[in-house]
A protein has these predicted regions:
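Short, surface-exposed ligand-recognition loops at beta-strand->loop->(often short) alpha-helix junctions
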Residues: 16-19
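Vicinal oxygen chelate
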Residues: 1-14, 24-25, 31-132, 142-148
């Protein structure tokens, strides 16, 4: 395989939000992401955004509810489809308990408190928690506590 471009991962998820601009700020404040790139459309809407967390990245885009779907596929966030999630984002953090408390204080809905998930001696153990952001995307934050 060819190497990926600098500062990119081989897989990069894109999250769609009704109010992408507000969620960019919220994701940075609550979950610790950093804004790397923001591209605005003619009307000031978020066309493309790259948020990083360590070596990881997610892209953020604005919903276009009334517009003709780009590429023939409508893109909607969970709030626009009755809260349904078709994916979760998992992020490794240094301290899952501290990260959880920071996210909770910033308004994240914690759906699973930090807990160790042990997959056996031949595998690993992680301390993880689950959170939902204000527009309904599900996130998992994990800290490796044993194993590779």
């Amino acid at each position: 395989m060819k190497p990926v471009p600098q500062h990119w991962q081989r897989f990069t998820p894109t999250l769609v939000y009704r109010d992408a601009r507000a969620m960019i700020d919220w994701l940075c404040a609550a979950f610790g992401f950093e804004l790397r790139l923001l591209v605005e459309g003619d009307a000031g809407e978020v066309e493309h955004c790259e948020l990083t967390y360590g070596e990881g990245m997610v892209m953020v885009s604005q919903e276009h509810i009334d517009a003709t779907p780009r590429f023939g596929v409508p893109l909607r966030g969970p709030r626009s489809v009755a809260g349904i999630n078709t994916q979760n984002i998992m992020v490794f953090v240094d301290d899952a308990i501290a990260h959880c408390e920071h996210a909770r204080a910033a308004g994240a809905t914690i759906v699973a408190e930090p807990e160790v998930h042990d997959y056996g001696d031949e595998y690993w153990a992680d301390r993880s928690y689950g959170a939902v952001d204000p527009e309904g995307h599900m996130w998992w934050f994990s800290e490796r506590v044993r194993g590779a």
